[in-house]
Curated annotation (Swiss-Prot):
Reaction(s) catalysed by this chain's protein: L-threonylcarbamoyladenylate + adenosine(37) in tRNA = N(6)-L-threonylcarbamoyladenosine(37) in tRNA + AMP + H(+)
Coiled coil: none
Protein name: tRNA N6-adenosine threonylcarbamoyltransferase
Family from the record: Belongs to the KAE1 / TsaD family.
Amino acid sequence: MRVLGLETSCDETGVALYDSERGLLADALFSQIDLHRVYGGVVPELASRDHVKRMLPLIRQVLDESGCKPADIDAIAYTAGPGLVGALLVGASCAQAMAFAWGVPAVGVHHMEGHLLAPMLEEQPPRFPFVALLVSGGHTQLVRVDGIGRYQLLGESVDDAAGEAFDKTAKLIGLGYPGGPEIARLAERGTPGRFVFPRPMTDRPGLDFSFSGLKTFSLNTWQRCVEAGDDSEQTRCDIALAFQTAVVETLVIKCRRALKQTGLKNLVIAGGVSANQALRGGLEKMLGEMKGQVFYARPRFCTDNGAMIAYAGCQRLLAGQHDGPAIAVQPRWPMESLPAV
């Protein structure tokens, strides 16, 4: 089965073609970072308009690179949620229109299920069951995964997601957008131990997260330095390192707890923040101590992309699942409500 995947949940337009026997045939992506940078964050209306502009050229690019024609497509998968409603509707409308024109089924894919399954595109994919850490700009969740659609939520952020905290903290200390990569870049030049930030909610039982306090702690630390006459680049680097270390160690502690609680040895880390090298290093060290293994997608499939949507959609289509002709999206959509495959 050949599935065309469309991703338009936020500020990346992604298109990919996946073959159930041959694997990924082609993928293309356009990032809107430069469009939104001047505003310091994603502007939903601009995101939707740019998806309209980019979608068809990217589809043509993927078909050309794969050597396929519309007649070779067996089905279409698209991100149906969660995400920005206008952006989601662009992808859903395009998918349903092509499905109608080409006489093929379409299936809406949960954006975070796409992220969760992205490591399945690698040469050594994880095997069920495993614990997944979904960590992105909109989500921070620990999930027990026993199969596709068989998800048990173990813990989640009660306020800001980790990626959101990265972006907001970067803005508070005068860094550019997107903040996550900027924090990571400056942290490489930070002085270890100059600032020590708290590890929120690690002093109590449970697997939930809270990162809004770290954002405030970072701002207060920066303001104290500025008031003392120190607004240097090195101080920004030191705060970035302290913030990143606190987030990474908090995530590592909670992942260790989740693995011990479930008795599982394999951990999947997915979502945009999974590209952070400090986080990968911390989790690899922890899994090494536990005699377990950590899995993640290659860096370009950590952020939003069409390949993960094509793969996830293919699995559900092979199980006989597909949508009706109505154009419908779900900006809020709990992943544990998905049917099993």
